[in-house]
């Protein structure tokens, strides 16, 4: 039994210590202590989420989706780590449980939890439609950092980064290799769970695309809230597990050779 599973809750004496509900077309932030678990859960209907994570004491150290993709592939699941940006390059969190791991890859090459889509944003929407829309995931995440963390708008927007698309069903087309989205298979009760390997600040947007099977970056799609729950575990089961360490590279870059 894996530590992150529901079946393991009693064995490892886990206790829920916090909970955040993310409203549709909005974002919320949350804190996770090193050694705790956090779970992103569908609670009312099919809904995808765009996840940013930061090292809680240094928001310049943030999730690096490109490096995570290079190490694991286009989609991630149980056992895969979410690596941080240069010059830190360490695991921020590890996925410990995934109720959608049964989906695998479909005949079109689609799968869930991708690290290939960047996030919906108002700039691309303006470019392609010449309209303004303020509730794309990029804006939602920026707004949450400004409102809940008292970060200036320009600073917040600069640290919002390419996301883990939680529950999102995506891939590349077989013929043109273009990015595609399909309706997510997620249903209420499904969740993706993580183990925090350092103190984390998370930010999660409930995407305006809903299950991302139709309209995107608008108010057309039916959207639902997402739940983030934080879990503590009896520390005797974590003996020998230490915080992840930042890269030991000396950052000389050949200048003293």
Q: What is the meaning of each model-derived region?
A:
Residues 32-40, 192-209:
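Noncatalytic modules at the cell exterior or secretory-pathway interfaces
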Residues 69-170:
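Low-complexity, serine/threonine/proline-enriched polar segments
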